[in-house]
């Protein structure tokens, strides 16, 4: 399987390139960066699967090109909140090929998300909810894709279990607030925290990344799944790279 990386000159693109070059199961194909030698069309044409580690500002262009020449995609880029156009293009592409959407490819982040949804169903609205994330000073996204995903699963769980609407930055009788905080400092690879806080206690779910290699390894798990399972076209999440159901 020939793998092409979109955003190949960035931090994660460079790391994944090194890891792919050290394996025998995959072939590192031509990658794309804005200052690179290959056009986006040629990168799509000359690879069997694409991994997107670029930026949310490039997603529209990439997905439009893929709709003209569909190839399986691991979409590991932050997806803006309420990005209807991007969502629509991802769903259209998934009609033709497998599309795995995972803004965070680490195993721990996936488990944290599932546990956060569980706790949102357990604790009622006497528990306030806070989501906080910290990344290195060079990260461009004002809010990480992982934090957006955490907010989304918390809102969904509250709606389904308690029939209560939650949102970021809103607090009225009908809509409860989720506090969302982001910091860009130092060289932090990634830290996400979900806290449920009442007048009498709090419980905190915290996931900390010590090495960005965990994201590259998670991407390899998903690539392994694509080879081993030969999945039909469809819209998939990061759970496809896990060996067990969580």
UniProtKB/Swiss-Prot annotation:
Q: Give the Enzyme Commission number.
A: 1.17.1.8
Q: What is its main location?
A: cytoplasm
UniProt feature coiled coil, ranges: none
Could you say which protein family the record assigns here?
Belongs to the DapB family.
**Residues noted as binding NADP(+) in the record, renumbered to the chain:** 34
- Catalytic residues at 135, 139
Question: Is Cytoplasm found in the keyword set?
Answer: yes
Q: Which SUPFAM superfamilies match?
A: Glyceraldehyde-3-phosphate dehydrogenase-like, C-terminal domain, NAD(P)-binding Rossmann-fold domains
Q: What is the lineage of its organism?
A: Bacteria, Pseudomonadati, Chlamydiota, Chlamydiia, Chlamydiales
Recorded protein name is: 4-hydroxy-tetrahydrodipicolinate reductase
Q: Quick one: which pathway?
A: Amino-acid biosynthesis; L-lysine biosynthesis via DAP pathway; (S)-tetrahydrodipicolinate from L-aspartate: step 4/4
The primary gene name is dapB
**Residues bound to (S)-2,3,4,5-tetrahydrodipicolinate:** 136, 145-146
Its function, per the record, reads: Catalyzes the conversion of 4-hydroxy-tetrahydrodipicolinate (HTPA) to tetrahydrodipicolinate.
PROSITE patterns per the UniProt record, alphabetical: DAPB
What top-level class of enzyme does the UniProt entry assign? oxidoreductase
So which residues are the signal peptide here? none
- Write down the HAMAP family for this protein, in alphabetical order: DapB (MF_00102)
Please cite one Gene Ontology biological process associated with this protein.
diaminopimelate biosynthetic process
Keywords for the protein's UniProt record, in alphabetical order: Amino-acid biosynthesis, Cytoplasm, Diaminopimelate biosynthesis, Lysine biosynthesis, NAD, NADP, Oxidoreductase
